[in-house]
Amino acid sequence: MSSRGHSTLPRTLMAPRMISEGDIGGIAQITSSLFLGRASVASNWHLLQARGITCVINATIEIPNFNWPQFEYVKVPLADIPHAPIRLYFDTVADKIHSVSKKHGATLVHCAAGVSRSATLCIAYLMKFHNLCLLEAYNWVKARRPVIRPNLGFWRQLIDYESQLFGKSSVKMVQTPYGIIPDVYEKESRHLMPYWGI
């Protein structure tokens, strides 16, 4: 159990691999049956086959599915803008990832860059099916794909979802000199030094 009273991921999921083509590229293994990546990963038939991926969840409005017959495709038509209603898809996508896993398949969730939309959906899945609080789920995904950065509207929706699931929230929106941001971003920004030029 974690310090927040939530269980952590099973030990069998504790050592995922990261297959990298650079920080922004590549595919990150989030659990034994869940992968997160950018759109170019979904176009790599050999990579999908090699990872045992059977379902591709496309969280974009701008990128079409490849519709190869070997894979099941799910389209989640979302723009990467703060007011996009990603919360409407949390349960549907999480349930699909879980269903694919129960059938011994694997799911790739992708958006354009694998940074905001797809990361948000993976975080929601970890909260629902692995009983992680939002902070734990975010840190878990970020450790495997360091470039993730859900937009501020998605954070608000994740915070609401966590409150619905667990009756409390582990991440807060805070006022900073940069505007209102999730406290996890505020903690990250403390390590940044302003550069004023010389």
From Swiss-Prot:
GO molecular function: MAP kinase tyrosine/serine/threonine phosphatase activity; protein serine/threonine phosphatase activity; protein tyrosine phosphatase activity
Family designation: Belongs to the protein-tyrosine phosphatase family. Non-receptor class dual specificity subfamily.
Record keywords: Hydrolase, Protein phosphatase
The EC number(s) this enzyme carries: 3.1.3.16, 3.1.3.48
Domain Tyrosine-protein phosphatase: 26-167
InterPro entries: Atypical_DUSP_subfamB, Dual-sp_phosphatase_cat-dom, Dual_spec_Phospatases, Prot-tyrosine_phosphatase-like, Tyr_Pase_AS, Tyr_Pase_dom, TYR_PHOSPHATASE_DUAL_dom
Organism, as annotated: Mus musculus
Gene3D superfamilies in UniProt: Protein tyrosine phosphatase superfamily (3.90.190.10)
Entry annotation: catalytic residues: C111
Record protein name field: Dual specificity protein phosphatase 14
PROSITE patterns: TYR_PHOSPHATASE_1, TYR_PHOSPHATASE_2, TYR_PHOSPHATASE_DUAL
Function: Involved in the inactivation of MAP kinases. Dephosphorylates ERK, JNK and p38 MAP-kinases. Plays a negative role in TCR signaling by dephosphorylating MAP3K7 adapter TAB1 leading to its inactivation.
GO cellular component: cytoplasm; nucleus
Catalytic activity: O-phospho-L-tyrosyl-[protein] + H2O = L-tyrosyl-[protein] + phosphate; O-phospho-L-seryl-[protein] + H2O = L-seryl-[protein] + phosphate; O-phospho-L-threonyl-[protein] + H2O = L-threonyl-[protein] + phosphate
